[in-house]
Amino acid sequence: MRIIPSSELIINGDGTIFHLHLKPEQLADIVILVGDPGRVAMISEYFDTKECEVANREFLTVTGTYKGKRMTVMSTGIGIGNIDICVTELDALANIDFATRQVKDNFRQLTLVRLGTSGAIQQDIEVGEVVFARTSLGFDGLISYYEGRDDVCDLDLERAFVEHTSWYAKLPAPYFVDANKELFELFKDSTREGITIAAPGFYAPQGRWVRVAPHDKSLNEKIESFTYGNRRITNFEMEGSALAGLAALLGHRAATICTIIAQRVAKSACTDYKPFVRRMIEMALDKLSTL
């Protein structure tokens, strides 16, 4: 069995994983991921008990219980690269023996649910609504660095999207990965469903124009008009595709759920969105406590 070199998986001197600074025993099977470290406190204030709180860089983690169910909530920071770190290190905490540096014989499946904020790209989706990313669409290219990319992606959907948008060849190839079906069933009665884009940036990658124009100024209109059967693209965020793709490759359950705080078609945004986020958090905690 392969022994993972110390240069590939760095374990700190205190037995914690390199970036997250967590020990395996500090990780629950249910993990809620948020971008903002401040949102960790917002979620963990609902916990009945707290067993640990660990902070390193932008990664703040609290493990405790909610209605008797053990959960971990962790901030990832912003962007796809941070999701690559978080999901890989969470999987290592669950499935690598730190003493032998080998994969454990018994696989431990994690449930990874991202709770985020997002901008709607369809006129009928209002600020304050909650969207479940039944499929994540990645503009980032991360999953193509991993073996097995085509095994977890919807290649027909990818081809249809590339053709519809006349996708610029110098950009990373877009990819589509479905959320876990059990998690969709869990949340479907409390959310809208759609295809959610994960962009590798906040400005031009999402069609925003401040001083430098996007390469394709009509891309958002093409995105808005794209349909595949009865499916359509509903919203933008910045992390979900890597979460869905890596979780699928590693065998974990994953989903991204976002509160809409901007209406890109109407060119409006809400800056006082915390009540909407809190409502999403309460809903998600109650749902996850039933697993």
What are these regions (language model features)?
Residues 241-272:
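Zn-dependent metallopeptidase/amidohydrolase metal-coordination segment
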Residues 263-291:
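His/Asp/Glu-rich mid-to-C-terminal helical/loop segments that flank catalytic regions of hydrolases
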Residues 156-228:
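Active-site rim beta-loop-alpha module in soluble metabolic enzymes
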Residues 1-175:
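Metabolite-binding pocket within alpha/beta catalytic cores that recognizes anionic/polar moieties
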Residues 220-226, 230, 236, 240-246:
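A short, acidic, amphipathic alpha-helical segment used as a generic capping/interface helix at domain edges
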Residues 119, 136, 197-204, 242, ...:
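Glycine-rich beta-alpha junction loops
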